[in-house]
Amino acid sequence: MRLADALTPGAVTPDPSKSREEQLHELETAPRVPEVVLRKAKQLTDSATNDAEKTRAIYDFVSAKIETVDLPLGATGFSVRPADEILGSGYATQEDKFILFNSLAKAAGLGVFPILTGFCDVTASAVPRPSVFKHLDIVGGGPHYRWWMDPSLEVAPFGLITPIKEKFVFMLLRANHVYLANPNALIDSSFWLWKEPPKGPPFPEFQKVSVNAAVTSEGDLSAKVKYTMRGDNELLLRVAFHQTAKEKWKDVAGLLALSDGFRGQVTSVDISDPMATKDPFTVGYEITQAKFVDWSKKPVRIPALLPQIGLPDPPARQAAGEAARTIELGTPLDVETQMTLKLPAGTVVQTPAGTSVERDYARFTSKYSAAANTVTASRRVNFLMREIPRDRAMDYTSFVHAVQSDQAQMITLVPAADEAKPAKSSPKQ
């Protein structure tokens, strides 16, 4: 049995002795949607006013209310259960989730297709074996909309899937989407094609980080760090916290802190509900670091307590005769970081100059200021394009250098005790 048929329990194989109309009708009507699934689909979509709302209602249910059995794709030999059995059990493999989603969608007048990822060979003459693929996503919805979805993760926002590295994915198509108006269209129960995956989320990506910190007269640091995010990083953290026991959340936050250049001990963690996917995901933690500042040093210099903004590396020098390639900047992303740092009373602060660099493909700005014993700093980078031509390598290298130079700037602190000391008098001549 072909894989598209295997993923459609109750599917029929077209009978070539019948007319095209009869064959297509059989493919459209089989398998029939079980009564319990029909009722569930009606319950889920009754208040929906369009295909987008119907698709999202079904997705939210299959994603969050049907528990995922975390098995590798094909671990059961693609032996799947009927939709009504999956619905009644409340649990499903990633293949089972497609079965249930497909049946609910059909009941609501929608269409979805399985997408196999993790392998790509568009030049092969033979159909690839199912065992070479690693994961199953879902694409579909109404006739004019195509959403990419992954209900197996349980916490992925609607339309957001794990980034796909391959240039193409394997899409399975059943022929109930072949139109009789095309007399050359083969009536077959299992078509397939290689399809380009989405290049990024269906909504703008952003990440906001705020740091509220204080340094004591002993040099100890305490800080509250909060992330608010949408996009690929959001999905990564939702999955990480969702799959980690609450008593281990400090470990996850500790890794996040290290990745952003913060050292110390995470003392508490607070996150938004990973399953509340309609809103951006938030992560907050408190971190302490003893002897962050050594006041005995003259002068005292510290970095701005902001996550380092990562940039794609400039391209290496192009070899003679090598075909020109584009410079990949990734999905357009807006990253905004802000810091407020309280210092001991009387501390004198010298802040560096801010930076502003603007290109058509990206913008970067930074600001630093001090008032009394409080330092504020902010940095923001906004990538506007996914890629730029290779011949702009020098310009991009200059942009990267400006950002890196800004992030390397230090804040100078003069303790109150030193400021109060009278200047040494010059020896008498």
Residue ranges and their predicted role:
Residues 1-429:
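A sensor for short, sequence-defined functional sites
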